[in-house]
Amino acid sequence: MRPSYNDDGFSDDEFTNSILTKRDEQDDSLESMTFGALNSAQNELLGKKKKKKSIQTESKKRKYSESESEEDSEDSEEESDSDSDAPPQENSSRGKTSRFQKNGEKKKRSKHAPAETSSKKPVSRIREIPGLKSSKESTLYTDIRFDPAYGKADLRKTRKDYAFLDEYRQSEVKSMETMLKDKKSGQMLSNRDREEIQLQLQSLKSRLDTMKNRDLEEKILADHKRNQIKGFKDGQQNNPYFLKRSDKRKLIQKAKFDSMKASQREKVMERKRKKRLGKEFRQLEFNQPRH
């Protein structure tokens, strides 16, 4: 007990002696404590500090998520009021609040979960479909020579400009034919290589034939047009006219027959006769009554 000023019987020496005895008693009690007790007390103090920190972080995260959800809801309401005709946007407020678990760790997102987008980002008019090529990608590496904006290509001009390729094709056909006929080169080739060469030879021959027929048709029609203009200028024809498709076909067939040899005409007539007979037989089989 601390002495008062009125207490005359308690001297200063006695007061100091009492304080020293109390300190000695406290030191004796600390000396008697073990290291295990001190360690457990320290761990308890650290655990309390960690709990306080985790509670503070959780409260901060909750406040942050709640503020974000409120902002997103306000933005979505404003956008819905401004653009009533626009497509609905995905609300990401639920996803943001449920992203964190109770212990504060981030949740693992499922790969089958729907896509989440921010409500602040405006929705595009053209919906982007994953896996589908956009118009930008399709027109990014196109050749301007074949752009439809420049109009249709002039086939006559291109055929005239690249007519020299027919000579290369004919020389290639001749080299393939000699390769197949030659016995030495034929022994070196396998059956698969031989079949590939034969297919290439057949495709080249058919391509040359189609080009020759096309050139012949264009020449026949150009001659007919020239004769019409000449007759109109001379006064033999009143008005030049455009041919129908059926008239064009008849004119081309007549000109082809005139340019053919006798053996070629017979082959063509025989092919047409067989085709007509097969058509008639099919009609007869179809018209027969079923039993």
UniProtKB/Swiss-Prot annotation:
Comp. bias intervals (Acidic residues): 67-84
Compositionally biased region (Basic and acidic residues): 125-136, 255-269
Example of a GO cellular component annotation carried by this entry: nucleolus
Matches recorded under InterPro entries: RRP36
Region (Disordered): 1-138, 174-194, 255-291
GO biological process, one term: maturation of SSU-rRNA from tricistronic rRNA transcript (SSU-rRNA, 5.8S rRNA, LSU-rRNA)
Family to which this protein belongs: Belongs to the RRP36 family.
Subunit structure, as described in the record: Associates with 90S and pre-40S pre-ribosomal particles.
Name this protein carries in UniProt: rRNA biogenesis protein RRP36
